Amino acid sequence: MKRQETRLWKRGAAGLLAALMLLGAGCSQSGGNAGSAAPETTPAQEVQETEGQTTTFVDDLGRELELELPVTRACVANRYNNELIRAVGAGDCVVGVDIYTSQDSVYWPQFGEEETFGKDEYDYEKIVALDPQVLIVPRNGQVEESIEKLEPFGIQVVVITGWDNADVPKQIRLCGELFGKEEQAEELVSFYQEPVDYITQQLQQVEERKTVYWEYGDDYSTCIPGTSNDGWHNMILMAGGENIFGDASLAGKDIDPEQILLADPDLIVKIYAGEVVGNSGVFTAPPQEEFAAKAEEMLQREGWKDLTAVKEGNFYLNTAFMSGGLGKMIGAAYMAKWLYPDLMTELDPDALFTQWMAYQGFEPNAQHYYHVPAQNAAA
């Protein structure tokens, strides 16, 4: 482990935030929104020099688009996309979002009802009224429909998939290229890659990987390769775990509870976010008492107190807001630490999460995970 990398991981949020404020440049001359880590520093004449010039931009689906770059007005679907855009210093360029983003008024105070264009179905009239140059959607979003509805108005549809952890650096660099934030994007790629490389290096010492049962917000729903929860399966693999439901031939996301008891996993992780839209969670985590109540409910499941992970204290609840951060790298760091604490001595997931929040212009206001106490024989 390089000392320089260790310093990066241990670096305080305040120092990182100060550096980001120097590097970042917003899209408006007004100085930026609350929660944006990067205020406006780009001179207006630099933007004017590029007006009318188009560049071929290749999006996440490999589509070649002729765009005027950098983009200065965008509507963006998917909270993970919005986080990447804000992290590279282009948060002020976003003029409209979906409800998965705007529901979190603490984390995204600049987006209210007027700036929200829908949930899984988009309000195209509102998007047109917001006057963006582009609509950014993930590849599992309303891509074809959006193209059909918006291109007659001169609004291009760009595919960036911020939730996809198969190639996070690619998604970051797409954001950097689109908004003219290439330098900031490369810094973010480095922040992502260093802990990933460290985890990979340390896992070379593991002869037999430990098993994991990961549960989503709905009871007995999990991540199976090839489903829309595939990214969470990849997170388990990145952390050095073996998904007990990692068989791609399994259909859907719901599983037979009996299979959990038969597998007797080494680690159990449950996504819990409280009362929010979807399972992605929000900046303000549920209180520890609420996490504990959900854990107690799960412990009442038949046979659960006899599970190895439960008896040995390897049972955690956490939010997808935290574990899904930066292409689920944050979640992989926590899981790797929980699985192999003796190997991951240089890994500090709390520090990584704090630094990721600094990229967003925030400091964590609550703990986003809960460690369920070991349920020994006395329990």
Mark where each language-model region is.
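Short helix-initiation/N-cap motifs at beta->coil->alpha
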Residues: 60-62, 114-125, 248-257
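Structural recognition of the beta-strand scaffold that forms the well-ordered cores
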Residues: 73-77, 95-98, 118, 134-138, ...
